Amino acid sequence: MTIESRINAINYNFNGTMGIYANDFHGNVIAMNEEALFETASCIKVPILATLLKEVKQKNLSLEEKMTYHQDNFIDGSGILRALTPGLSLSILDFATLMIIVSDNIATNEMIDLLGVDRVNETCEELGMHATKLHNKIDFSKYSQLGTTTPKDYAVIFERAYKGTLWSEDMSKLFIEILKKQHYNTMLTKALTPYYFDAEDTGDEEMLSIASKSGSMDACRNDGGIFFTPYGGYVLTILTKGFSDKLFYPEHETYKYGPQVSKLILEHYLSKEGRF
């Protein structure tokens, strides 16, 4: 039974569409609906970060430069800046980190103001992510979309970072360092054995770490990132759409089927000692 057949069996009762792309960096991929378009939700924050790192690499910006939280960029939703006072000044790196690890929407809007929508989209084209587009800043009262991508496109930046070719080795390392601090990775980790991530009581090294970025809106629940294992690393993206339940809660069906797919792919990879 192929890995794709096993994934289809898991998703048999899923009331929606799931797109998957996984790359083991040995010429093997797992792909389903990999070129279908999906809403990005906060996954678009990964190309925004990549654009920032390109500007830093080109010395157009410095990560130590200060930015200010402006009142007109206030937006509800994820993040912590909405609980703080406008006028707060932080470094560009701090804003970028908040944008990724707690998916801060205000920090994201500040980053979009800094970089510009067009520059982010130019970066996507430069990276070969031709189906990926940032449509606008985050404003739930004005826009129903934030961005679009495909599972295969979304994997590109993770693949580049893993290989050290996201602008440079240093920029790739910084990208991974930031994404490893991610607070929200339910889709990728919910079904995995906790021991993989926390072996403090045994003295053993932790078996698994992940650098990832998720994204959720009414119409989608997405995640993607790099899995680092004792056998090496692989990239996995899981995007969903078309389900009828728009509510946000831990037992949403996307967080039932998506994590099972992630677990299956990890166990398949480990059983083949670093291959798909």
What residue spans do the PLM features occupy?
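A short, well-structured edge-of-sheet supersecondary motif
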Residues: T2-E35, E65, I238
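Short, glycine/proline-biased beta-turn/loop segments that scaffold the active-site neighborhood
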Residues: Q58-L84
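Structured C-terminal helix/loop/strand segments within mature extracytoplasmic catalytic/sensor domains
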Residues: M1-A9, V29, T165-T186, A191, ...
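Active-site SXXK
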Residues: E39-M67, L236
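Mid-domain, small-residue-enriched loop/turn segments at the edges of structured enzyme/sensor domains
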Residues: F14-T17, E110-E169
